[in-house]
A protein has these predicted regions:
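Short coil-to-beta microelement around the adenine-binding A-loop and adjacent beta1/P-loop entry
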Residues: 18-19, 74
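Short hydrophobic beta-strand immediately N-terminal to the Walker A/P-loop
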Residues: 34-36, 48
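Walker A (P-loop) phosphate-binding loop of ABC-type ATPase nucleotide-binding domains
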Residues: 39-43
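Helix-to-loop junction immediately C-terminal to a conserved catalytic motif
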Residues: 52
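Conserved ABC transporter NBD signature motif
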Residues: 60-68, 75-80
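Conserved ABC ATPase "signature" region
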Residues: 100, 104, 111-127
Length: 133
């Protein structure tokens, strides 16, 4: 088995009284091919978003490629790739955070470029609004 490249220990995420992810722990080692399966609403996307530093866990810790997923988010994101099964806005992120996330997939990290894009499409001033999907 190769080195551990993803480590999740007791990852938990609650939204109010609802527990979306409940103390999930696993390891992924270099060279492994992994399928992360489960029914709709089982917490798969929430877990992936925590591993990418897009969503902070209520409890637990995770490392990706040796970086703390919650304290070294930029290092994790620049070394990771993620594509959603279908395009959708994340309803708990702001307009800016949603655009920055998808822009980052394509290597665009410039805040000024993202803000200019918002201005160009008439969304200037909405950067901090939650999208609500």
């Amino acid at each position: 088995m190769g080195e551990c490249i993803v480590l999740a220990e007791n990852l938990t995420r609650r939204f109010g009284e609802f527990t979306a992810v409940d103390h999930v722990s696993f390891e992924i080692h270099a060279g492994e091919i992994v399928g992360y399966l489960g029914p709709n609403g089982s917490g798969k996307t929430t877990t992936i978003r925590m591993l990418l530093g897009l969503l902070e866990p209520t409890e637990g810790r995770a490392t990706v490629l040796g970086f703390d997923a919650f304290r070294q988010t930029e290092e994790v994101r620049t070394r990771s790739g993620y594509m959603s099964q279908k395009f959708a806005l994340y309803d708990d992120l702001t307009v800016y955070e949603n655009l920055a996330f998808y822009a980052g997939i394509y290597g665009v990290r410039s805040k000024s470029q993202i803000l200019e894009t918002l201005n160009r499409v008439g969304l200037s001033g909405t950067e901090q609004e939650i999208t609500r999907g």
